[in-house]
Amino acid sequence: MGKGGNYVTVAASEVDELRRKNGEMEKAVEEMKKEMLQLWRRTQVAEEAEERLCSQLAELEAESLDQARDYHSRIIFLMNELSRLSSDSASASP
């Protein structure tokens, strides 16, 4: 009974150790799940922000293109006016 009793004691202590380690691992898994959920939420927020920024960038690009076209038209108009005024002043000179 001596050896058998020792074996049961060792087995019981091993079971206790395994239960303790299992509990630690379960806590670690729960912590990892929480961290993963937080990272997922942060990723979602970042993706939504990226979508908003892309949308804003597209709007700004369209606006800048419109402004560039307006400025180009204005420059052409002013060049034509300058040319016309130069021609008028040259023909008006004696």
Curated annotation (Swiss-Prot):
InterPro entries documented for this protein: LSU
Protein name: Protein RESPONSE TO LOW SULFUR 2
Annotated function: May be involved in defense responses monitoring. Probably implicated into osmotic stress signaling.
Phenotype of the disrupted gene, per the record: Enhanced tolerance to osmotic stress. Increased susceptibility to pathogens such as P.syringae and H.arabidopsidis.
Alphabetical keyword list: Coiled coil, Plant defense
Native organism taxonomy: Eukaryota, Viridiplantae, Streptophyta, Embryophyta, Tracheophyta
Pfam families, per database record: LSU (PF24980)
Ranges in a coiled coil: 15-63
Inducing stimuli: By stressful environmental conditions such as salt stress, AgNO(3), and sulfur deficiency. Induced during oxidative stress. Accumulates at the beginning of an extended night, which may indicate that it is induced by carbon starvation and in response to sugar. Induced by a combination of light and plastid signaling.
One GO BP: regulation of defense response
